[in-house]
């Protein structure tokens, strides 16, 4: 099939999964073109069936800001005409599903172009934050309902979309996935020595995110403070975002500034996750929780909030630990238990790795997208 994939290029679950999906589909013989504002973060090595097309939104003085939606629709029309897309797969409802909808209307109006089917994948904040905002909610609901097919990355997100936006679309759940050959235990001993300052007794606690408010990075610092009262540890922050600075300031205010290491955005996350002893994810909500799945694949235990899609792959006390978002004391207690009980630690990381390998590897999930593409194309021809 000829497939266009629209996504964000930044470090975040939706863009990472969209790019990994594009790479996997190309490897399986499909012609895939990625469309985004810039080269996606996880865009890998060259493949003859995979290409990238940037969207450029020029600035004109009469307009208050760049019109990315219109530029995106225009680019999708151009690339679809060139490659005769069977499907345009939009990851994240706004603005990508809206851009795909406009492109489909333009192609259909010409009377001579192939009109692709539009599939929208919902990832989380496109529904829970953007979609819930009255300024966007009707547009988001319209774009979802106008899609030929809709998927969500978790059962929780599907239920929340129906409840909050009252959409009529049939939403298929297809979860996120990982290349399980790539995501495995592969620690970097030199990195560990640097981060622990050559102290073999020091544990490394890590948080990976885009540092938006929903990720609650200040809560990460507070949980770390409580764990550190019982276990010698340092906190490693991976990623960039609006709340990173305030989280670091919070650590300094608590006298923990010297115990925090900021690594910024990192393309090669496997050795970092494998080097850590514990991952904290106290989010207010998670459409899926890809960073938790990545940690489990790398045999690093996760303590997280019992929200969104996380309970759909983390079983509390078995493959990880889940607590209400505001119960930071319980999260800290679970962290201390893992870091001081070797049997519990090994049992948890093995169970986590087993869950990933059984249910969330590329070969288990990508064929479900292929089947869904065929179903939508054949059903609506």
What are these regions (language model features)?
Residues 5-12, 18, 23-68:
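N-terminal strand-loop element at the rim of the active site
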Residues 151, 198-224:
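Conserved donor-binding/catalytic core segment of Leloir-type glycosyltransferases
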Residues 156, 177:
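Carbohydrate-associated surface elements
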Residues 184-198:
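A short helix/loop element that forms part of the nucleotide-sugar donor recognition site in Leloir-type
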Residues 248-264:
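Nucleotide-activated donor-binding/catalytic signature segment of Leloir-type glycosyltransferases, i.e.
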Residues 265, 284:
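Aromatic "clamp/platform" in nucleotide-sugar-dependent glycosyltransferases that forms part
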Residues 301-304, 314:
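Short hydrophobic beta-strand element within catalytic cores of glycosyltransferases
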Residues 316-317, 321-328, 337-342:
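Conserved acidic donor-binding segment of nucleotide-sugar-dependent glycosyltransferases
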């Amino acid at each position: 099939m000829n497939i266009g994939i629209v996504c964000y290029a930044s470090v975040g679950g939706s863009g990472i999964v969209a790019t990994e999906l594009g790479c996997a589909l190309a490897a399986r013989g499909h012609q895939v073109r990625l469309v985004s504002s810039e080269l996606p973060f996880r865009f890998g090595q060259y493949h003859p069936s995979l290409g990238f097309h940037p969207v450029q939104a020029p600035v004109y003085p009469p307009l208050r800001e760049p019109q990315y939606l219109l530029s995106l629709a225009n680019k999708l029309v151009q690339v679809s005409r060139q490659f005769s897309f069977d499907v345009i797969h939009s990851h994240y409802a706004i603005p990508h599903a809206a851009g795909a909808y406009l492109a489909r209307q333009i192609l259909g109006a010409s009377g001579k172009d192939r009109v692709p089917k539009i599939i929208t994948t919902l990832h989380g904040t496109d529904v829970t934050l953007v979609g819930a905002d009255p300024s966007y909610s009707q547009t988001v609901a319209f774009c979802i309902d106008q899609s030929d097919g809709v998927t969500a990355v978790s059962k929780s997100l599907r239920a929340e979309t129906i409840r909050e936006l009252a959409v009529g679309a049939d939403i298929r759940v297809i979860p996120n996935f990982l290349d399980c050959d790539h995501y495995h235990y592969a620690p970097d001993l030199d990195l560990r020595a640097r981060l622990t300052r050559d102290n073999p007794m020091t544990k490394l606690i890590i948080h990976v995110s885009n540092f938006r408010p929903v990720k609650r990075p200040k809560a990460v610092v507070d949980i770390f403070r409580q764990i550190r009262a019982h276990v010698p540890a340092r906190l490693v922050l991976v990623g960039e975002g609006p709340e990173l600075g305030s989280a670091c300031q919070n650590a300094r205010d608590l006298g923990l500034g010297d115990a925090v290491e900021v690594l910024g955005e990192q393309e090669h996350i496997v050795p970092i996750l494998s080097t850590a002893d514990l991952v904290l994810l106290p989010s207010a909500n998670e459409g899926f929780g890809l960073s938790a799945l990545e940690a489990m694949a790398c045999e690093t235990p996760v303590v997280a909030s019992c929200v969104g899609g996380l309970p759909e792959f983390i079983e509390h006390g078995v493959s990880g630990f889940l607590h209400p978002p505001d119960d930071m004391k319980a999260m800290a207690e679970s962290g201390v238990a893992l870091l001081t009980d070797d049997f519990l630690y090994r049992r948890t990381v093995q169970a986590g790795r087993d869950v990933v390998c059984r249910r969330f590897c590329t070969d288990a999930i990508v064929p479900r997208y292929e089947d869904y593409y065929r179903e939508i194309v054949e059903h609506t021809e």
